[in-house]
Amino acid sequence: MGKKLVMAQKRGETRALCLGVAMVVCAAITYYILGTTVLPLYQKSVWTQESTCHLVETNIKDQEELEGRKVPQYPCLWVNVSAVGRWAMLYHTEDTRDQNQQCSYIPRNLDNYQTALVDVKKVRANFYKHHNFYCFSAPQVNETSVVYQRLYGPQILLFSFFWPTFLLTGGLLIIAMVKLNRSLSVLAAQK
């Protein structure tokens, strides 16, 4: 009976130890992936200063108005605001500026032009309802653009690193409990 209990205990310890090591390895892989994808985007984001933006004007540009340039196949909302004592171009997110520097907002549904136009008009109406709103500006003096919503802010970074940290802590606790259990069983066997 005692030998069966020791064998079952060893198998359970081995399984728990493998679980703990697997959790630590998964956490390390996740840290690596997040460190190479999310962290550089967070460090690249220059819009760190939260400020109040005041709406100056909005305009919906269609294909006809953008002659001579790369013409987007969707209606383009252009928003000009006053922020931190200077005029600036408002972009919905950091990615909006990278996709098209002429547009403040790019609609979600780009397949249907009329649906995209309705979406752009709805966003424009929201700007007219709320003339003052919070935005993010760059601390550099020569920056002429502001961002309405940060995709890569500190909250996203904290949320991204929470689960791998939880996984790493859980794995280390399981490994520590198995080691503690082994040392206590050795001490009990010596008495």
UniProtKB/Swiss-Prot annotation:
One of its GO terms (cellular component) is plasma membrane. GO terms for molecular function: calcium-activated potassium channel activity; potassium channel regulator activity. Residues 40-155 are extracellular. One of its GO terms (biological process) is vasodilation. Keywords: Glycoprotein, Ion channel, Ion transport, Membrane, Transmembrane, Transmembrane helix, Transport. Weakly expressed. In brain, it is expressed in a few discrete populations of neurons that also express KCNMA1. Its main location: membrane. N-glycosylated. InterPro entries: K_chnl_Ca-activ_BK_bsu. The chain crosses the membrane at residues 19-39, 156-176. It is a multi-pass membrane protein. Glycans are attached at N80, N142. Residues 1-18, 177-191 are cytoplasmic. It is found in: Membrane. Pfam families: CaKB. Interacts with KCNMA1 tetramer. There are probably 4 molecules of KCMNB1 per KCNMA1 tetramer. Belongs to the KCNMB (TC 8.A.14.1) family. KCNMB1 subfamily. Regulatory subunit of the calcium activated potassium KCNMA1 (maxiK) channel. Modulates the calcium sensitivity and gating kinetics of KCNMA1, thereby contributing to KCNMA1 channel diversity. Increases the apparent Ca(2+)/voltage sensitivity of the KCNMA1 channel. It also modifies KCNMA1 channel kinetics and alters its pharmacological properties. It slows down the activation and the deactivation kinetics of the channel. Acts as a negative regulator of smooth muscle contraction by enhancing the calcium sensitivity to KCNMA1. This is Calcium-activated potassium channel subunit beta-1. It comes from Rattus norvegicus. The gene is Kcnmb1.
